[in-house]
Amino acid sequence: MLAKRIIACLDVNNGVVVKGIQFKNHEIVGDIISLSKRYTKEGIDELVFYDITASTNNKLVDRSWIKKVAEIINIPFCVAGGIKSVEDAQNILSFGADKISINSSALIDPDLITKIANRFGVQCTVVGIDSWFDSDKKKYMVQQYTGDANRTYQTDWETIDWVEKVQKKGAGEIVLNMMNQDGLQNGYDLSQLNEIRKKCKVPLIASGGAGCADHFYQAFDHANVDGVLAASVFHKKIVNIKDLKYFLIQKGLEIRIC
């Protein structure tokens, strides 16, 4: 059995780590390098860096800090932000990232998923999906350009259909960003996760809503996700990573010990 993963998310804007609520009103929370060191020392399994404005500003994520991160940590990390081509992915991987994640660019050109997977392998190819519950349609819908609240808009894709599409195109992992829950710290959207899990045959990472240790357990136990991603509870030290891992081990989960 593969160990379940605990992942820290670092949203990056203009070279610093920020955090918002439901992808809005971001505040600075710290420095990229110092937070990377801290989380590695505390025993996190993986880091994910999202340059939240790269796609909306039509630019590639700043590679200078990627190289610095690669030099100071010894755990896998994934980078997302403005990746529009195989060459962009190559640049980021060559600076030391273990995986790349695409989101808005995959919606524009789904074949980009296939091209990246064929070139670097599915293990390097992550697709992020920003999902929002549309109360009028009573459906979960995919959002695009979520790094800028003024440019965010709802696509025609239902989340469940897009999950199936990206798998067919070669996604090796899916990060489901549940926007309705993001930053609220009242738990992951287990209902949505369960529905997505039925259709998702690749590793599924839950993102959005963690507020306490039990929320992580619920995502693993009730929805059988492969990893849980969180930001606020780690940035603010609401949840201690080592304590979280021992809590999950006591619950019977396979977790990498710090």
Curated annotation (Swiss-Prot):
Keyword tags: Amino-acid biosynthesis, Cytoplasm, Histidine biosynthesis, Lyase
Main location: cytoplasm
Location of the protein in the cell: Cytoplasm
Enzyme Commission code: 4.3.2.10
GO MF, any single term: lyase activity
Gene3D superfamilies linked to this entry: Aldolase class I
GO annotation terms (biological process): L-histidine biosynthetic process
Signal peptide start-end: none
Active-site residue numbers: 11, 130
HAMAP family in the record: HisF
Subunit record text: Heterodimer of HisH and HisF.
Function summary: IGPS catalyzes the conversion of PRFAR and glutamine to IGP, AICAR and glutamate. The HisF subunit catalyzes the cyclization activity that produces IGP and AICAR from PRFAR using the ammonia provided by the HisH subunit.
Alphabetized NCBIfam families for the sequence: hisF
Protein name: Imidazole glycerol phosphate synthase subunit HisF
Organism of derivation: Buchnera aphidicola subsp. Schizaphis graminum (strain Sg)
Organism lineage string: Bacteria, Pseudomonadati, Pseudomonadota, Gammaproteobacteria, Enterobacterales
Designated gene of the protein: hisF
